[in-house]
From Swiss-Prot:
Catalytic activity reported: ATP + H2O + 4 H(+)(in) = ADP + phosphate + 5 H(+)(out)
InterPro entries: AAA+_ATPase, ATP-synt_VA_C, ATP_synth_F1_bsu, ATPase_a/bsu_AS, ATPase_alpha/beta_chains, ATPase_F1/V1/A1_a/bsu_N, ATPase_F1/V1/A1_a/bsu_N_sf, ATPase_F1/V1/A1_a/bsu_nucl-bd
Gene expressing this chain: atpD
Species assigned in the record: Haemophilus ducreyi (strain 35000HP / ATCC 700724)
UniProt name for this protein: ATP synthase subunit beta
Gene3D superfamilies to which the protein is assigned, alphabetical: 2.40.10.170, Bovine Mitochondrial F1-atpase, Atp Synthase Beta Chain, Chain D, domain 3, P-loop containing nucleotide triphosphate hydrolases
């Protein structure tokens, strides 16, 4: 392959000169003689290409030889990546020796064509009551997990990985984009303790790494997920955090000298997001279901980054600090969370009516809270007292002990089937369990467990 030399270094941006007849293509990976990998971003003319460094540019100097690999970055894919931690280039960073890949795929790939895509809306049962009832996931759908610090985004993610790995024998890929190294480390140990590490591939581009790494690490993880999908599997693809993917794009864009757009974001924000999201899709062979943690800067949902993410999501799971402060986990807000799948044509009339009934009861309770705070429960009508009693039972029944949180709760985790979830909430709404005290509903699995618990009270 052609050889060039470094002519300019500006931080993470490196200009390389090649012979006029052998200029690398955009997105080609170049290898510097020091071992650093560069990715071509722009062709400047006259044999010059502008690249972004996928690693620290410390110690580079002008005149160093650069070789064109002739391909985009290629990463290992297949079952050998399971249970391993890799960086953006697919190199192992867990000190467990080489990966021994079955194949290597380019990280820049075209999204599946219209003919290949599958349009069935099959539900993915997660075993988590509040998600299955209020904001059901679709196989091959995209889910946004919105929440502040400490309300349980990571624990929810780990429970989903665990449930799908064990109950559906599915594989998961976790891309830590701009992660804190400590969080990545915690996640690895949690997965090991839950015995699901052999079903998860972990790809990390930590906070301290150059913007090129953080921008590409989501694509590396996605490429590994696509390989599993093309083998006919149903894969889960987790991204934490999609906001930091956007932020890395902003840094790269500024370094390349592009004119910034609204709020200083890159002018190509929608395109970059689209390139990633359009590849996360189901084909007739298998599905990729993605769960993306979304940080909302300054709680402003109209900020260009979350606003661009919203356009691609099928379900939004909103985690609420108020619910977490009541000790109800998972702290999903049933009134704020939405799903495109909550439609009688998709989930059926019974599921739809129960979910809307639950939301209606909780909404009425929310309206009555002010009256209760001022005048007390005694001033309510009999009907309203019944609504409050049922709403409080529903609130508590939406909590659930997680398998990955057994060390915190001290109670064994529960997986609740969708059928049991609907039966339980339907019974509460119809007054079947009005005689059972509300504390019996807290941190329970199915409704049978609640009845059994109440009989011992």
């Amino acid at each position: 392959m052609a050889t060039g030399k470094i002519v300019q270094i500006i931080g993470a941006v490196i200009d390389v000169e090649f012979p006029q007849d052998a200029v690398p293509k955009v997105y080609d990976a170049l290898k510097v003689e020091s071992g650093l990998t560069l990715e071509v971003q722009q062709q400047l003319g006259g044999g010059l290409v502008r690249c972004i460094a996928l690693g620290t540019s410390d110690g580079l100097k002008r005149g160093l030889k650069v070789e064109n690999t002739g391909n985009p970055i290629q990463v290992p894919v297949g079952t050998k990546t399971l249970g391993r931690i890799m960086n953006v280039l697919g190199e192992p960073i867990d000190e467990k020796g080489p990966i021994g890949e079955e194949a290597r795929w380019d990280i820049h790939r075209a999204a599946p064509s219209y003919e290949e895509q599958s349009n069935s809306t099959e539900l993915l049962e997660t075993g988590i009551k509040v998600i299955d009832l209020i904001c059901p996931f679709a196989k091959g759908g995209k889910v946004g997990l919105f929440g502040g610090a400490g309300v349980g985004k990571t624990v929810n993610m780990m429970e989903l990985i665990r449930n799908i790995a064990i109950e559906h024998s599915g594989y998961s890929v976790f891309a830590g984009v701009g992660e804190r190294t400590r969080e990545g480390n915690d996640f690895y140990h949690e997965m090991t303790d839950s015995n699901v590490l052999d079903k998860v591939s972990l790809v990390y581009g930590q906070m301290n790494e150059p913007p090129g790494n953080r921008l590409r690490v989501a694509l590396t993880g996605l490429t590994m997920a696509e390989k599993f999908r093309d083998e006919g599997r149903d894969v889960l693809f987790f991204v934490d955090n999609i906001y930091r993917y956007t932020l890395a794009g902003t840094e790269v864009s500024a370094l390349l000298g592009r004119m910034p757009s609204a709020v200083g974001y890159q002018p190509t924000l929608a395109e970059e997001m689209g390139v990633l999201q359009e590849r996360i899709t189901s084909t007739k062979t298998g599905s990729i279901t993605s769960v993306q943690a979304v940080y909302v800067p300054a709680d402003d949902l109209t900020d260009p980054s979350p606003a661009t993410t919203f356009a691609h999501l099928d379900s939004t799971v909103v985690l609420s600090r108020n619910i977490a402060s009541l000790g109800i986990y998972p702290a999903v807000d049933p009134l704020d969370s939405t799903s495109r799948q909550l439609d009688p044509l998709v989930v059926g009339e019974e599921h739809y009516n129960v979910a809307r009934g639950v939301q209606g009861t909780l909404q009425r309770y929310k309206e009555l809270k002010d009256i209760i705070a001022i005048l007390g429960m005694d001033e309510l009508s009999e009907d309203d007292k019944l609504v409050v009693s049922r709403a409080r039972k529903i609130e508590r029944f939406l909590s659930q002990p997680f398998f990955v949180a057994e060390v915190f709760t001290g109670s064994p985790g529960k997986y609740v089937s969708l059928k049991d979830t609907i039966r339980g909430f339907k019974g509460i709404l119809e007054g079947e369990f009005d005689h059972i005290p509300e504390q019996a509903f807290y941190m329970a699995g199915s409704i049978d467990e609640v009845v059994e618990r109440a009989s011992k009270m």
